[in-house]
Amino acid sequence: MSLATLIIIFLALGGWSSVSAQIEQKWKPHDRNRPAPAAVDPGAPGTETTPGRPPQDAIVLFDGKDLSKWAHKDGSAAKWKNADNYFEVVPKTGDIFTRQPFGDMQLHVEFAEPVPPRGEDQDRGNSGVIIMGLYEVQVLDSYHSKTYPDGQAGAVYGQYPPLVNASRPPGQWQTYDIIFHAPRFDDGGKLLRPAHVTVLHNGVLVQDNVEIHGPTATSDPYKPHAAKLPLELQDHNHPVRFRNIWIRELADGD
């Protein structure tokens, strides 16, 4: 049988997609011996007066009581204001970082912009959720306030504007639900796969599994880094409030 004939037969059978499907199909459809997923209490959504309840398997980063799971870059205790079920940026005290590092994750953050609103453009309720201390999802008062599109609320800062502006008025609690897959590097530091992020702002999809081009604070290319790094919240000199922050670590998809 000639090589050309073999290729024709191979393509007729679906080519690589057929082979790939056979390799990946470890379990038969409806196989009752297939391991069942663990049951997890999904928690409950919040209201304007009450924070939501995290899922049972979440790592709670702020439970409404203290900031013990956060620190400044030098390791000192977080100096942001801790109030009744929320905490607030204290301008000029510096960004805060989780004491625990994270990689692939499902992240939930609730925030509220200052009231009354002050300033315009980037000087209006500015903060940021900086994943791994490198990849920022912008926090900003974008309700009836204009700025450059890749710098408004829900943007991957400096790279992707949000698909829509889903902002609520200042003072109302808002949510980010973020699915993040960290970049992968080989042992020599070569980039194997860039980071990807999906963001829902107040339940509305604003970033759809976009490929992050590198650190968002600069236009620099990727540099190799650890598989897990702390989550960072930004002090941009505005008293933005946060509550009900939790993470579910995701299994390595490689």
What spans do the regions from the language model cover?
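Bacterial N-terminal signal peptides
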Residues: A4-G15
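Carbohydrate-interacting regions of secretory-pathway proteins
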Residues: S18-D254
